[in-house]
């Protein structure tokens, strides 16, 4: 058994890990199963989110929603990180959304801008809930790594609001799903 681990399993894990590091998802992402919306414009940058829902969901009824924020150390990453999770949750009746936000490698920003963008995304979702078939009182947020930080921060920290937004619309999610 030890020989198998040394000769097959461990080298396989190494190769797969190395391949994962080298594989860079394209940016901006292409997600043909989703509808794409611009939720915020900052200078020349349009921040987008991708909404996944089944055809049945677009025809009436209010459904719970979740918005995912990608990981990447506040430096990089792609909203496509949560594409599969969005597809799965949409197939189960939720409206699932993955959002872009500003990161340092593309926008020369700090982590505080990520939190501002996360709050803007939740606010946009609530503001557009009726046209998306979403129950505006059942909006969850989730993310992995830096994206988990964004989700946790928008749920717990006051401030970091973008100018010109309607602060009467809550930017706090009703539930959280945080990874690592």
Residue spans for each PLM region:
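Bacterial N-terminal signal peptides that target proteins for export
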Residues: 1-10
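Bacterial N-terminal signal peptides
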Residues: 9-19
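N-terminal cap/lid segment of alpha/beta-hydrolase-fold proteins
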Residues: 24-60
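Mature catalytic domains of secreted/periplasmic carbohydrate-active enzymes
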Residues: 37, 81-84, 103, 109-118, ...
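Short beta-strand element of the alpha/beta-hydrolase
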Residues: 61-71
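A fold-wide structural signal in alpha/beta-hydrolase
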Residues: 65, 93-100
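Catalytic nucleophile-loop/oxyanion-hole region of alpha/beta-hydrolase
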Residues: 78-79, 85, 99-136
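Primarily recognizes the serine-hydrolase "nucleophile elbow" in alpha/beta-hydrolase
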Residues: 120-180
